[in-house]
Amino acid sequence: MVRGPAGAWAVLGPLLWGCGLALLQGGMLYPQESRSRERKELNGLWSFRADFSDNRRQGFEQQWYRKPLRESGPTLDMPVPSSFNDISQDGRLRSFIGWVWYEREAILPQRWTQDLGTRVVLRISSAHYYAIVWVNGVHVTEHEGGHLPFEADISKLVQTGPLSSCRITIAINNTLSPHTLPPGTILYKTDTSKYPKGYFVQNTNFDFFNYAGLHRPVLLYTTPTAYIDDITVTTDVDQDTGLVNYQIFVQGSDHFQLEVHLLDEEGRVVAKGTGGQGQLQVPSAHLWWPYLMHERPAYLYSLEVKLTAQTSAGPLSDFYTLPVGIRTVAVTERQFLINGKPFYFHGVNKHEDADIRGKGFDWSLLVKDFNLLRWLGANAFRTSHYPYAEEVMQLCDRYGIVVIDESPGVGIVLAQSFSNASLQHHLEVMEEMVRRDKNHPAVVMWSVANEPSSFLEQAAYYFKMLIGHTKALDPSRPVTFVTSSSYEKDLGVPYVDVICVNSYYSWYHDYGHMEVIQLQLATQFERWHEAYQKPIIQSEYGAETIIGFHEDPPLMFSEEYQKGLLQQYHVILDQKRKEYVVGELIWNFADFMTDQSPQRAIGNRKGIFTRQRQPKSAAFLLRERYWKLANETRYLQSAVMSQCVGNSPFTV
């Protein structure tokens, strides 16, 4: 832990790190309504208060969770989901580090509070970074990590007494330490001639703003007390027969029956089974294909599971439906294969980032982004640099957008961040991530980290253990991390299945000299492949551009420079994709916010779209390229032409 001048950890810490996380058990199925399940979203306005006290502990010392938050002092209306940073006009809140408090009163349906055969669950989809939760003043759960969901069974708290409401209080701390994901450090400024006593700043080693708050939906949902806890599905193909292997876990009863039906998109039952595990065979199966690779992409079956259980209160039934895409993924020395066919990633890196809402989930923004992805002809993106919202993954399944699913392992550059404590937490994060996203056909590869100091001696053991653990959790998908180290010094790449390389030739060095890009990029690819004989993805490349800046001949930050740099990369990518390069992902889809610095003009401007999703010149260049690539690499001839005539906009 980072320690202050008195030898104790930064005053933000004592309540933050009081307990370690045990290895995860149980499922994390997405809450859905069914014949046996209900859900109540708690999105909207919450009461909010930041703890501006010197030690950031006033809320705990005064036990703000024991009574309505408004009684503790002034509160703000805070929208959920949203980051809190850009909502208010108080500049202190934008860069606030420490504990903030959220509260919401929820009115519950009478059946939820009186039917003892009903289980009531509170689910928080994302709270950045560390969260403690109380219901009616009673502690119910804690969670470390800002990008994955967590839950608490609150049935006993809401099913006692005449109350038909519950008061939910959530305290969130956004402090990052060398052992968090992502990591960071607290730096105390001790020169009292320049800084007030106790002044500190949060330092990070990643290039995006450390937005915080309740970023994704908060909701209540119900199940019977005997319920379907988890479902795991893997798929395979035997000639034209699709194979769906399933495993179902039940909680709340040892005496139960399970019925499983697989339905096609027309609602017809194509296979059925019984029991907690088995294999369904689907003759003449429709496979799940990526967008633009097939005339019928993203085909989804529905796996309907019915549980009938005997309990002390009598028989109970539970129903859950899981979308299933039948597809295979494989990697050779030179190819990435989906359903046995070579797949070429032509896509983007993204961020969950937008004006005002920060990293807050927004359906309007999400649908707009997917419309832009399809307009662009992109077939893939990486969830740089953390797991995205579950709803994002669901749309990827529906639209056929392939996903490299990345953990929050960004900024792992200090030796302390390779410690056993860091590794243990990273292993747990991968468990949470795989548990949540394992059933999404769009997810074709796990990425455990981005640009770590993989040249450090500790990195070899760290990535051997981390990648091995991820493969043990999910043997069906390849695993990678994204490197910016040199091929001869990287100690983690020997353990990956696909080499993902970030490089910024003629941007972060050789400024303005685009004439060296082709030589340097070709050399990069040749040395990596000669050393490891693995397929390679150019996982990041790009240039910063401020829309409306024009210079000819091209100068840095102009739209012409961004276009010219991309064109130089594309020359070599076109050569090497015929050999062993299997993808290219531009950095970035859209401009995004960063910490303030002389190097950043209100954020990172490497997007091909502005933060408001307006296209720069490079967007049209990339669109022309991606549609050309789609036509060259499609599996069936009618795949692209049926949706894009003359490379014109289309409606799906």
From Swiss-Prot:
Organism: Sus scrofa (Pig)
InterPro entries tied to this protein: Beta-gal/glucu_dom_sf, Galactose-bd-like_sf, Glyco_hydro_2, Glyco_hydro_2_AS, Glyco_hydro_2_cat, Glyco_hydro_2_CS, Glyco_hydro_2_Ig-like, Glyco_hydro_2_N
Glycoprotein as UniProt keyword: yes
Record carries keyword tRNA-binding: no
Superkingdom of origin: Eukaryota
Transmembrane domains' residue ranges: none
Record Pfam families: Glyco_hydro_2, Glyco_hydro_2_C, Glyco_hydro_2_N
Record family assignment: Belongs to the glycosyl hydrolase 2 family.
Description of how the protein assembles with itself and partners: Homotetramer.
Regulation: Inhibited by L-aspartic acid.
Keywords linked to the UniProt accession: Glycoprotein, Glycosidase, Hydrolase, Lysosome, Signal
Glycosylation sites: 173, 420, 631
Signal sequence segment: 1-22
GO cellular component, one term: lysosomal lumen
Active-site residues, Swiss-Prot/TrEMBL: 451
Cellular compartments annotated: Lysosome
Protein name, UniProt field: Beta-glucuronidase
Enzyme Commission number, as recorded: 3.2.1.31
Enzyme class at the top of the EC tree: hydrolase
